[in-house]
């Protein structure tokens, strides 16, 4: 696939062509978050509270995967823009190796620490038990999640946003379909309750990764995973983490905020924790479209910076900043319009 269009195509049409597929997939993903909460709420109030308590940990795991993926994406795009394909391959390969290490560590830590973590916010044995059951299944798919995010960022780095859109949407749609089937038990499927919600999510994430792998092998892209680059290079590792760590912290800090708020609210009522969890799920419906635009921007910034097109970098940044601001203002207006009258 020829990626020179990232420095040749007019800026606004380029941003729209890169961002709109991601905006659409992010909207579907945010819709899933709301639907998932709706079905879990049908189980019991305790199940919804458990999901709200597990949510910041899930968000932290996603932050590590996505944040480091941003580093992979930026480094690959930079080297492609500079015309150094070998370095781009090295960044992709070593980024994948490091992401897999992150996945294994997060899986072990998440599953082993969850009972103690839940006990910090509630004394209800039912809520803790439901939270542990959900998290054991959900966190078992952590390695699949981080590898999937890595391939997502690799495809985005070469400008292949359609594959990313299709993969994410297919994963979300199968998730939405399987949620009621596995939670309540339809046809040959047993009733699994909150564990069914976790399994449905895991199956959706597995499908997303499977699509990436099929496309990668059937329709090769410009960047390749190469055995010769598996051994980690100190320079490349530093470059990946120098971008990945700040991005991870930026995404992970809200998880710490939610956990702190949960600890405060737990002193009053578990219902408050439930309401806060629902609010953050609804908030993503506004935030994720803006995030989709930013995801479309990242490879463009990296590619043009690597190619020395500093003027285009500035143009891209300013246009995306305006587009994101417009979405946030519209979201704020929508919230005020929908506020119930007292």
What are these regions (language model features)?
Residues 1-19, 76-143, 189-245, 301-342:
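Short alpha-helical transmembrane segments in multi-pass integral membrane proteins
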Residues 13-73, 77, 245-265:
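Signature of the first transmembrane helix
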């Amino acid at each position: 696939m020829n990626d020179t269009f990232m420095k040749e195509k007019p800026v606004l049409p380029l941003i729209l062509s890169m961002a709109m597929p991601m905006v659409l997939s992010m909207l579907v993903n945010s819709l899933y978050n709301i639907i998932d909460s709706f079905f879990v709420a049908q189980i019991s109030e305790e199940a919804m509270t458990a999901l709200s308590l597990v949510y910041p940990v899930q968000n932290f795991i996603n932050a590590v995967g996505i944040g480091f993926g941003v580093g992979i994406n930026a480094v690959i795009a930079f080297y492609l823009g500079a015309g150094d394909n070998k370095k781009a391959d090295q960044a992709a390969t070593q980024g994948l190796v490091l992401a897999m290490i992150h996945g294994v560590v997060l899986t072990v830590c998440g599953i082993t620490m969850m009972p103690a973590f839940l006990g910090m916010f509630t004394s209800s044995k039912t809520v803790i038990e439901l939270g542990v059951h959900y998290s054991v299944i959900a966190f078992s798919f952590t390695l699949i999640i981080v590898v999937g995010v890595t391939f997502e960022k690799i495809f985005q780095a070469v400008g292949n946003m359609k594959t990313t859109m299709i993969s994410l949407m297919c994963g979300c749609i199968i998730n939405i379909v399987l949620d009621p089937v596995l939670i309540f038990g339809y046809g040959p499927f047993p009733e699994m309750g909150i564990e069914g919600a976790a399994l449905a999510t895991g199956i959706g994430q597995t499908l997303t990764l499977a699509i990436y792998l099929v496309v990668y092998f059937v329709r090769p892209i410009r960047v390749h995973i190469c055995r010769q680059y598996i051994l980690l290079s100190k320079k490349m590792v530093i470059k990946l983490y120098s971008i990945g760590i700040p991005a991870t912290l930026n995404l992970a800090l809200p998880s710490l905020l939610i956990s702190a708020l949960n600890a405060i609210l737990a002193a009053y009522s578990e219902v408050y924790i439930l309401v806060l969890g629902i609010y953050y799920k609804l908030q993503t419906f506004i935030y994720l479209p803006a995030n989709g635009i930013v995801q479309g921007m990242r490879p463009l910034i990296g590619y043009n910076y690597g190619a020395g097109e500093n003027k285009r970098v500035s143009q891209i940044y300013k246009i995306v900043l305006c587009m994101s601001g417009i979405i946030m203002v519209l979201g704020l207006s929508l919230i005020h319009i929908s506020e119930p009258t007292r």
